[in-house]
Amino acid sequence: MEIAKKAEIIAVGSELLLGQIANTNAQFISKELAEIGVNVFYHTAVGDNPERLKQVIRIAEERSDLIIFSGGLGPTKDDLTKETIANTLGRPLVLNDEAFRSIEEYFAKTKRTMSPNNRKQALVIEGSDVLANHFGMAPGMLAEHGSRLYMLLPGPPSELRPMFENEAKPLLLKKLGSNEKIVSTVLRFFGIGESQLEADLEDIIDAQTNPTIAPLAADGEVTLRLTAKHADEKETERLLKETEAAILERVGEFFYGYDDTSLVKELSKACRQNGITISSAESFTGGLFSEWVTDLSGASQLFAGGVVCYSDSVKQHVLGVKAETLAESGAVSKECAKELAAGVRKLTGSDIGISFTGVAGPDPQEGHAPGRVFIGISAEGKEEVHEFNFAGSRTGIRKRAAKYGCHLILKMLDQK
């Protein structure tokens, strides 16, 4: 089939039109399609109404040769996407045995009774390629009709994303007749803003052809997605490594990992590799740092314990902060952060103690504006306190502080 040059994404679900959820699926699919040279020209959202969906399909067929639908594949009466598309294409829905077995196994495993309407989820458009759903029950499908491709994907992002990456994208490339190997890698950076990163890499980004470079900033981090394509897979890898090396030569000090990793995952890995234990004293972060660390498997190997020390009494009587420190410098201070880190390290017997004290907002505290944060680190022969002024919501400030905590310990371990 000739490569599709015009793609359209149709998100189905009244909850989108009511503003109850954001259409993050369209953003994800557009980014993935751009990497394989397919241009998305239209995003459409339509409610759970078959007549309006038919109208949207007719419009899409006039201007697009790849039409991707997300949502409406569930078991309820308002999940009408595949029924409407099957009717439009003049094809029946047939039971997919593999999908039905998967649904039966799910209910047997969870010891729940399967409802008759769950069978509906195993129905697929006759003649379509079935996209397995390893994270849910409703399979996706890719149907070819005339000069167009119709792709149906589930609505939940936790199901749609792996299905697209592992099932739909490879099949789509095959359908489009591309023999190029497309490989992507994501470089993750922390401690540098998107504008500064792009300024440092301006000439490299401006000159991009193959690989392409796509920057993205989110939650205080910056990522660069590098995507290379070539008929020879080894050449694709070489192109990626060459560009990665040029990037890291300039901003390598802010780089911390690849692809789907995170700061806390890298921290956990580094601590376990070095046989280091850590502990935390958290005031305004309220246990967020310790929650992140203990969410990961193997946390008992590295996390000695944590104290949520919101009150001055706990700071003083549990962690040993001096009364005069609290009286003279206050709880939100460099001095308090230093004593908290040392206190929790001593209390738990860990190799490294980290503390978080600050103002999450929205109101000021002790004369400090929201976003004023002190992070203390205590290790054998080394004590340091870092001061920050963050902006954003209460939740955003707390998350930013916890991320910087991971970052600072990683930097300390790198220096050993």
Swiss-Prot record:
It comes from the Bacteria. CDD domains: cinA (cd00885). It holds the Pfam family CinA_KH. Belongs to the CinA family. This is Putative competence-damage inducible protein. The gene is cinA.
